[in-house]
């Protein structure tokens, strides 16, 4: 995986699954959670889609791009079709909880 300057990749263990994320820390590594932007990719994509935007956002923001279940570096677990997209939203919530982020701005497509 090729990452653009300033972007790092890591795995986050949650109580649901192991999630791959890309991260660009703000100017201050202790950036407050409310200064966090979380990017969520669309179908047949991954967090890699967001790299250019991650570099372009203001440098005072912490930016995280999450790989949804079965995409990118995130564990491939089955999705319960009776729950609609709730498996995905629960995975995102579990990831933010594992990262200690209680408040964030969500962006997706």
What positions do the PLM features span?
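Active-site donor-binding loop signature of nucleotide-sugar glycosyltransferases
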Residues: 14, 42, 68
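Alpha-helical elements of Rossmann-like donor-binding domains used by nucleotide-donor carbohydrate transfer enzymes
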Residues: 7, 49-52, 56, 87-94
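Alpha/beta-hydrolase fold catalytic core
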Residues: 1-37, 58-61, 87, 101-103
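Short glycine-/acidic-enriched loop or helix-start segments at secondary-structure transitions
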Residues: 36, 49-50, 74-75
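Active-site loop/oxyanion-hole signature of alpha/beta-hydrolase fold enzymes
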Residues: 22-28, 65-109
